[in-house]
Amino acid sequence: MKLTSEKLPKNPFSLSQYAAKQQTFFQWKKEKPDYYRHANLVDTALQFLKERIRKGDAMAYFLRGQLYFEEGWYEEALAQFEEIQEKDHQAIYQLGVMYYDGLGTVADAEKGVGYMKKILDSSCPQTMHLKFAAAYNLGRAYFEGKGVKRSDEEAERLWLYAADNGNPKASVKAQSILGLFYSMKEPKDLEKAFFWHSEACGNGNLESQGALGLMYLYGQGIRQDTDAALHCLREAAERGNVYAQGILVEYYYKMKFFTKCVSFSKRIADYDEVHDIPMIAHVTDCLPEFISKGMAMASFYYARCLQLGLGITKDEASAKHYYSKACRLNPTLADELHSLLIHQRI
């Protein structure tokens, strides 16, 4: 399973201080709302930061690099962060992410790990808001065995540190991944999985909200509670959790709500597997693996409804198309569902 990096944590003190000192740009946005379009705003922001750099504003260097990063101009971002790494710990953090993930450069996991360790081992007060996120990323490296020797034990230790007992100001991503980790490891520890998904969900994590719905639905790590399950799943689905959407499709099918199943599943099944999965992952911060799994589930059940004419006019040619799509998206899940179909359990 491929995990994703923790996004750069915000430093509310430095950013708010910067905003308080530099009112020109923010006033410009208010005075010219018709000009507030993305391309224009980016260009103006770059000009603004260039002027701040000319006047000796040290923070403007990092903000320019971060703007490059957020726009996907990774080579420019990398060059900017390399230039200021000796003076800016946030640049060191971003270099760790970029080298590990191969953004703007050839992937070098060992170098990425080195940057993250530098953050975690630093005693500088300016690194405090970065430590939990760096620990999550190091845990990811140990879990994936990239840049370091693979170790689930070390990954777990680092994630527990990063999760900080459910602290909302720590790494909420680590809290969510611990929920996933305890539900996957052998032997499973579903009570711990439920605990960590609960903590992450309470701190706003969308992936864990869907996972909680699934655990309530099947009584995993907690007493079965269909009402609580549907509450979590529907809210997660509305917020864009595609796996939660897939679970709801399955629930509607099993409850014989075929019209609802068809209308809900078609929209999900028609997502573009090449372009939509990365986009949804970026927007929701959900793992691509579970996004594709939700799409596969929706595609399979939509195909079944088309095949049998449940809630929709029978169309076997279209059914074959969606069965094939489910197999492409997640062969293992499609095989499991096909086995249930053969045994007439679907």
Swiss-Prot record:
Localization in the cell: Cytoplasm
The TPR repeat ranges on this chain: 58-91
Disulfide bonds: none
Sel1-like repeat spans: 92-124, 132-167, 172-205, 206-241, 242-276, 296-331
Gene Ontology CC, one term: cytoplasm
Subunit structure: Interacts with LRP2.
Protein name per UniProt: LRP2-binding protein
Lineage: Eukaryota, Metazoa, Chordata, Craniata, Vertebrata
Gene: Lrp2bp
